[in-house]
């Protein structure tokens, strides 16, 4: 396939046009008075959203050179979303401003490499300043304020704060669609997995059709249990030791005479045991069984480690305060495992989350982490139409991410003002000279853009507001929702420092690379062949 090239100033201008097309589409959504964008979908209803990354993903430019610029900024939004989960619009606005200011200087003869150095140094200084001024989140009302600001809904803020309170910072909060109106919270304590009892005869509560085991022994087996001869020695030891203590068996499968013996003993009232299948498949099943073993203090019985069921003693069994088993689910509450072992396992899963590239793997690891660390909250969201439902779901997911980021690194004043105040550390150009000093100045000018557009979207003169905010003390700023100046943290207008920091760092990373670009290479569009078979008609 032939390629076509563009060089020098022409190339950079084409990239800038693409950057502007994407950023102009996204920046109308920033701030409490930002607008929405409607995205046409090939199938189903259109999507209405104010989520920067969702909009960015949909933008493709006709011109292949401009499209390169748009794709680069899309990368800014996506990366910020991956790291902080929110702040994608802020990142896009910053990238546009950095590109605009930077290219102006490159066109005037500044060295792109020196500009890049200056930009990188300035961003590092501003990031450090933001982290210094960050205030750790210590109570529920702060969490509610962060979530409410991101979701633009106070009730949702309080709901997320409650969910965070229940599951802790490692817990999982998922958003599901519901058929009813409004938003509800559903909390599952302990470790739950989606496998139920193997026989309905095992239930202890006929009315609710569930088996509740108080203070049971827990046997975890990696393979299938088919022969009662394998299980008998262990059952006898359990009866001798615990008398009436129930037993939960988690295995790949319990079948044949082993299952029928358990059921018969349960019906006769001689012994209470409940068998469930292990969740997941393959390596994931092994990992989840390992998690359960750590949580309950059990040892996984597996041929590969030389442990056989018929030789196992009571020391391989785990314990828990209570286990509830329904037709479809099993929940283990307060496992009897060693707290240090559980923390070690949590640290191991966190390390795996850091190192994985796959979103699917990351999601599954997060779920495992949550089950070990405390619990799972499901927020069910409903709305009048499918379009509104999707929009609310987007907002909720953003708000949860923002809240997590806030708990991690703390909060700064919101509404774009934290950046305006943080760039004051650049007033002496960090002691740089020449084009490097110009690079520092580029960051200083670009940092006011998020605040400017928050004000513009509220129908005000952007630069007038940014100048006024720059004169205020740290922590003070402009509240676009009320149109007043004041202490933003007190007013509940706060941003997670991780979101603001990631937005700036990712925007600068792409912008400084874009400034050092000299050539663009794109594929030559295929020429359409003229259709054959049409003769020339002549009129005489």
Swiss-Prot record:
Positions with a binding annotation for ATP: 29-32, 86-90, 415, 479-481, 495
Q: Which InterPro entries match?
A: Chaperonin_Cpn60_CS, Cpn60/GroEL, Cpn60/GroEL/TCP-1, GroEL-like_apical_dom_sf, GROEL-like_equatorial_sf, TCP-1-like_intermed_sf
Instruction: Name where it's found.
Output: Cytoplasm
Name the job this protein performs: Together with its co-chaperonin GroES, plays an essential role in assisting protein folding. The GroEL-GroES system forms a nano-cage that allows encapsulation of the non-native substrate proteins and provides a physical environment optimized to promote and accelerate protein folding.
Q: Mind listing the UniProt keywords for this protein, alphabetically?
A: ATP-binding, Chaperone, Cytoplasm, Isomerase, Nucleotide-binding
GO annotations of cellular component type: cytoplasm
**Pfam families, alphabetically?**
Cpn60_TCP1 (PF00118)
**UniProt cross-references to HAMAP family, sorted A to Z:** CH60 (MF_00600)
Any one GO molecular function term: ATP-dependent protein folding chaperone
Q: Family per UniProt? A: Belongs to the chaperonin (HSP60) family.
Quaternary assembly: Forms a cylinder of 14 subunits composed of two heptameric rings stacked back-to-back. Interacts with the co-chaperonin GroES.
**What protein name does the entry list?**
Chaperonin GroEL 1
CDD domains, alphabetized: GroEL
Cysteine disulfide partners in this protein: none
E.C. number: 5.6.1.7
């Amino acid at each position: 396939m032939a390629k076509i090239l563009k060089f020098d100033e022409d190339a950079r201008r084409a990239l800038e046009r693409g950057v502007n097309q994407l950023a102009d589409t996204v920046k109308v959504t920033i701030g409490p008075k930002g607008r929405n964008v409607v995205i046409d979908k090939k199938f189903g209803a259109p999507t209405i959203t104010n989520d920067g990354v969702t909009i960015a993903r949909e933008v493709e430019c006709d011109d292949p050179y401009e499209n390169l610029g748009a794709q680069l900024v899309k990368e800014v939004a996506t990366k910020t979303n991956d790291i902080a989960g929110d702040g994608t619009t802020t990142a896009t606005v910053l990238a546009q401003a950095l590109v605009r200011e930077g290219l102006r200087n490159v066109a005037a003869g500044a060295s792109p490499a020196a500009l890049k150095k200056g930009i990188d140094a300035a961003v590092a200084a501003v990031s450090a300043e933001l982290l210094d001024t960050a205030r750790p989140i210590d109570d529920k009302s702060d969490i509610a304020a962060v979530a409410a600001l991101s979701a633009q809904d106070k009730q949702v803020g309080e709901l997320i704060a409650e969910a965070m309170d229940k599951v802790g910072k490692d817990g999982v909060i998922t958003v599901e669609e519901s058929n009813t109106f409004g938003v509800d919270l559903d909390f599952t304590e302990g470790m739950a997995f989606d496998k139920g009892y193997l026989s309905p005869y095992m239930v202890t509560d006929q009315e609710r059709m569930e088996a509740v085991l108080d203070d049971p022994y827990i046997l975890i087996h990696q393979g299938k249990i088919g022969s009662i001869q394998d299980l008998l020695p262990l059952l006898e030891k359990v009866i001798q030791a615990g008398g009436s203590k129930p037993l939960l068996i988690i295995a790949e499968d319990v079948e044949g005479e082993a299952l029928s013996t358990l059921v018969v003993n349960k019906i006769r009232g001689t012994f209470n045991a409940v068998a469930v299948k292990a969740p997941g498949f393959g390596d994931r099943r092994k990992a989840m069984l390992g998690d359960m073993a750590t949580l309950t203090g059990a040892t996984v019985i597996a041929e590969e480690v030389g442990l056989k069921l018929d030789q196992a003693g009571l020391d391989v069994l785990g314990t828990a305060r209570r286990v509830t088993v329904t037709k479809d689910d099993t929940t283990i509450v307060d496992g009897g495992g060693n707290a240090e072992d559980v923390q070690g396992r949590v640290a191991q899963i966190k390390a795996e989350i850091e190192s994985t590239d796959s979103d699917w793997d990351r999601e599954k690891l997060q779920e495992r982490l949550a089950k070990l660390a405390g619990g799972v909250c499901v927020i069910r969201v409903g709305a009048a139409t499918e379009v509104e439902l999707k929009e609310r779901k987007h907002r909720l997911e953003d708000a949860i991410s923002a809240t997590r980021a806030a708990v991690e690194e703390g909060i700064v004043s919101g509404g774009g003002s934290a950046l305006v105040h943080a760039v004051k550390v650049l007033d002496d150009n960090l002691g740089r000279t020449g084009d490097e000093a110009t690079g520092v100045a580029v960051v200083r000018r670009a940092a006011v853009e998020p605040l400017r557009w928050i004000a513009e979207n509220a129908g005000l003169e952007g630069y007038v507001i940014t100048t006024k905010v720059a004169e205020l003390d740290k922590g003070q700023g402009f509240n676009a929702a009320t149109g007043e100046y004041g202490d933003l943290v007190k007013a509940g207008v706060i941003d997670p420092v991780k979101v603001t920091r990631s937005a700036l760092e990712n925007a600068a990373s792409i912008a400084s690379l874009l400034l050092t670009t000299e050539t663009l290479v794109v594929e030559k569009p295929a020429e359409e062949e003229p259709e054959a078979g049409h003769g020339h008609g002549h009129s005489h």
